């Protein structure tokens, strides 16, 4: 069963790009045509890139990774918070603070400050050690901290992957991820730079329905990864520690090929007595994998 169908992409308007005068020439290979001054994105490519990103996110989470959902534009705020919360992942949907990743120690102190303020009973003025004015100021501080840091309150270290809606608006997040070699999975509209993203998904990053659909797909990948992680943890083998970013990149590209190569000699060794009868079947297996 496909991760998402062509009909779903069409109904959500994923194929609509920006006006032809607002584009990045590097996105030319992802553009299908132009209609009424608007670029139309090639959804066949989008489907392929969605599958690739889905498998990567699922594999990363299955091996103990964390996905940080990022989208501060109005069209993305609700979907980012809803889908990230659904699968228990951190998110930023109000404002990206400079140094949120590269200076995480300072951010962690602000998160701790937020948790300390949450312990205060702002309604009990008489039993508090603060004056009414001080409580009001502390309440305002808490509200601001919750707005900026509430989505990452349980984040204890840099995430394994970033899911980003609109890489142009979230350029600070993209830059910090690059410095730390954290892979970026993102929607690529026709005005974006594909060189900034490790796992691009060509699509509309402005329409609410498009953002909702693609963010839900990424959250579904996280959910599958969590299930696989739990299944692995309940078995005899322990799940490995959170992988490094470079290892995560290699995981999606190389694991399937290695498994297929290791399985072929084992099958041949088990049935040496009937080479003639099983030769056609052995020859067909690689062809099916190639599809």
Swiss-Prot record:
GO terms for biological process: translation. The keyword Repeat does not apply. Residues 246-259 have a biased composition (Basic and acidic residues). Residues 260-285 have a biased composition (Low complexity). Pfam families: Ribosomal_S2. Residues 231-291 are annotated as: Disordered. One of its GO terms (cellular component) is cytosolic small ribosomal subunit. One of its GO terms (molecular function) is structural constituent of ribosome. Keywords: Ribonucleoprotein, Ribosomal protein. Belongs to the universal ribosomal protein uS2 family. This is Small ribosomal subunit protein uS2. It comes from Pseudarthrobacter chlorophenolicus (strain ATCC 700700 / DSM 12829 / CIP 107037 / JCM 12360 / KCTC 9906 / NCIMB 13794 / A6).
């Amino acid at each position: 069963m496909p991760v998402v169908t062509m009909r779903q992409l069409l109904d959500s308007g994923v194929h609509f790009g920006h006006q032809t005068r607002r584009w990045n020439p590097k996105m030319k290979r992802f553009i299908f045509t132009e209609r009424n001054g608007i670029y139309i994105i090639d959804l066949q490519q989008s489907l392929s890139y969605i599958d690739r990103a889905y498998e990567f996110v699922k594999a990363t989470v299955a091996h103990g990774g964390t996905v940080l959902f990022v989208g501060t534009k109005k069209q993305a705020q609700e979907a980012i918070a809803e889908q990230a919360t659904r699968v228990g992942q951190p998110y930023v949907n109000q404002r990206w603070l400079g140094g949120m990743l590269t200076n995480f120690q300072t951010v962690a102190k602000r998160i701790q400050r937020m948790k300390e303020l949450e312990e205060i009973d702002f309604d009990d003025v008489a039993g508090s050690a603060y004056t009414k004015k001080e409580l009001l100021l502390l309440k305002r501080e808490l509200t601001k901290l919750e707005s900026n840091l509430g989505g990452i309150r349980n984040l204890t270290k840099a995430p394994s992957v970033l899911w980003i809606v609109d890489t142009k608006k979230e350029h600070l997040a993209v830059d910090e991820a690059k410095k730390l070699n954290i892979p970026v999975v993102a929607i690529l509209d026709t005005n974006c730079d594909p060189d900034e993203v490790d796992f691009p998904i060509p699509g509309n990053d402005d329409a609410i329905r498009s953002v909702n659909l693609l963010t839900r797909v990424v959250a579904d990948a996280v959910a599958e990864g969590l299930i696989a992680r739990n299944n692995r943890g309940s078995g005899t083998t322990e799940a490995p520690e959170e992988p490094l970013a470079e290892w995560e990149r290699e995981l999606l590209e190389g694991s399937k090929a290695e498994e297929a190569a290791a399985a072929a000699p084992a099958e041949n060794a088990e049935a040496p007595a009937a080479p003639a009868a099983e030769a056609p079947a052995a020859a067909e297996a690689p062809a099916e994998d190639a599809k």
